[in-house]
Amino acid sequence: MGKKKILSEEEIADMVLPTANDVLGVAMRLLGFDRVLVKCQDGHERLCRIRGKMKRRVWIRQGDIVLVSPWDFQSDKRGDVIWRYKRNQVEWLRRKGYLTLQA
């Protein structure tokens, strides 16, 4: 059996939680050119753009849990990926009731 991943206090402090406008989702397909198809918790599939701050620093894979900020226009179809959660952060989100989707 593997070791249980323990979430440290500084990882919780650095973690970005969803606000009223943001939605959690699962990265379904990588489309290239910094675009990802994301299935969001509100039932919509959005074509999301990886924002410039994350492009080369954070690599998103299929099945990752991400935080999406829908655009002001075309909010049901488009959005920006603003955060990717690590595995232990996803477990914390599930325990606290933020995440109901299965990856």
Where does each model-flagged region fall?
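Short boundary/loop segments of OB/S1/cold-shock single-stranded nucleic-acid-binding domains
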Residues: 1-23
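Long, charged, low-complexity intrinsically disordered regions
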Residues: 2-7, 93-103
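N-terminal, positively charged regions that mediate nucleic acid binding
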Residues: 21-32
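Flexible glycine-/small-residue-rich
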Residues: 29, 40, 70, 83-85
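Short aromatic-glycine-enriched beta-strand elements
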Residues: 33-38
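Short, structured beta-strand/loop micro-motifs enriched in basic residues and often containing a Trp
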Residues: 42-52
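Short nucleic-acid-contacting surface segments enriched for D/E, G, S/T with interspersed K/R
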Residues: 54-67
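OB-fold/S1-family single-stranded nucleic acid-binding modules
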Residues: 72-99
